[in-house]
Amino acid sequence: MLIGFIGLGKLGMPCAEAVVDKGYHVNGYDILPRQSTKVDIKSSIQEVVEQSDIIFVATPTPHEEGYDGRDPTSHLPPKDFNYDSVKEVLTECNKYVRQEQVLALVSTVLPGTIRRELAPLVTNTKLIYNCLLYTSDAADDTPCVDLGGRRI
């Protein structure tokens, strides 16, 4: 099985390299120049999609100061994340993806956004969300319960 990662920042690169450490070949792409001794860095989204079975999308979703999840925000006016990069990547992936492949979105997305804004951009294959990826020591120390959900 060939794995792809689009977005090799603070979440994408550590996760991609961890997948390599488990014995898988990983293709990766980022809009910024990246280097890795483990991940096979590609020059385009198209290359990653065409050479991978599962493609993880780990692009940033910037947010306003104070909405990073560290402090409660229920007393503040609701603010959404900026999904422009996610939308661009999903739209580009959809041009090249095949029905038997899977797109897995791991970027931070608020509830309802997948169904309302992002899933409609992926028409040629399955889009899954909320797959758990951890960086650093969190993977070793975090208990995990995985529950099923509704298909989108």
Predicted feature locations:
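NAD(P)+-binding Rossmann beta1-loop-alpha1 motif at the extreme N-terminus of oxidoreductases
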Residues: 1-40, 47
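A structured beta-alpha segment of the ubiquitous adenosine-cofactor-binding alpha/beta core
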Residues: 43-48, 64
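An anion/phosphate-binding loop that grips the pyrophosphate of nucleotide cofactors and donors
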Residues: 52
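N-terminal Rossmann-like NAD(P) cofactor-binding module of classical short-chain dehydrogenase/reductase
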Residues: 56
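Conserved NAD(P)H cofactor-binding loop of Rossmann-fold oxidoreductase domains
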Residues: 59-60
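Rossmann-like NAD(P)(H) cofactor-binding subdomain of soluble oxidoreductases
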Residues: 63-133
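Conserved small/polar residues in nucleotide/adenosyl-binding loops
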Residues: 134-139
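Hydrophobic alpha-helical segments, chiefly the membrane-spanning helices
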Residues: 145-152
